[in-house]
Amino acid sequence: CQEKKPEKTVEETGCEIAVIAEGSGEADISVTEATWKSVKAFADEHELAAGKYEPEEASEEAYLKSIQQAVDDGAGFIVLPGRSFETTAYKAQTSYEDTDFLLIYGVPHDEKNNYATGANTVSVVFAEEEAGYLAGYAAVKDGYTKLGFVGGKEIPEIKRFGYGFVQGAASAAEETGAKVELAYKYAGTFEESDEVKELAAGLYKDGTEVIFACGGLIGNSVVKAAEEAGGKVIGADVDQSGLSDTVITSAEKGIDSAVTTVLKSYVNETFVGGTAFN
């Protein structure tokens, strides 16, 4: 099956594995891309049909409509990549009991924050603070002493990245005796914009050598600022070295490993729902 938009009429395709895209430009967009890449690679290897469904808008109603389309196309396994799918997953796991779900980056809950992971659902959450710690530690060990952190919005996972980055840099500074300076900023958005680029450019102008950019598409803006200023960037979520030579490393979450592990359990008929793991 090919990529589909729910507003179009789609014939039955026998799509076995579906990914519902979070296409609003929010923090989860890089997670969506990484998830789809992993799903497509797994499906191709196992000769299974996989499809990515792009909702009309970023809303629970649109997400559920895309899930219905995937089920109608024959999907037995649906991946929901991003925290914005938490309430959607909560409803879908009950409405489609014969379909297995993988929720990346969240745990199903209702509007009142009552959490429940159904018997047909597995949730995967990540320890961003650990990836952030390693990024900060490595940066100082590599000789960088003027660091910057630019997060998207102040949501828990972005904060965990930032806190880990600070702690990792502090640990390396203690070991090496280096005097480390760290500028800590939030962009207030997950979008690529001139404002984010200007924020990063200001940090580079003030002497920041490398910026850890966390949050959706803001990394693109930070990279542009780095290219103009001769600065460096640390990516987040997935390997972002392909964006630019300014990206020296990335704080990866291991999305590919998580997706592959759960998909293997699905095809081997050993899938056990009702669980959440890191």
Give the role of each language-model region.
Residues 4-278:
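A residue-level marker of the well-folded mature domains of exported/periplasmic proteins
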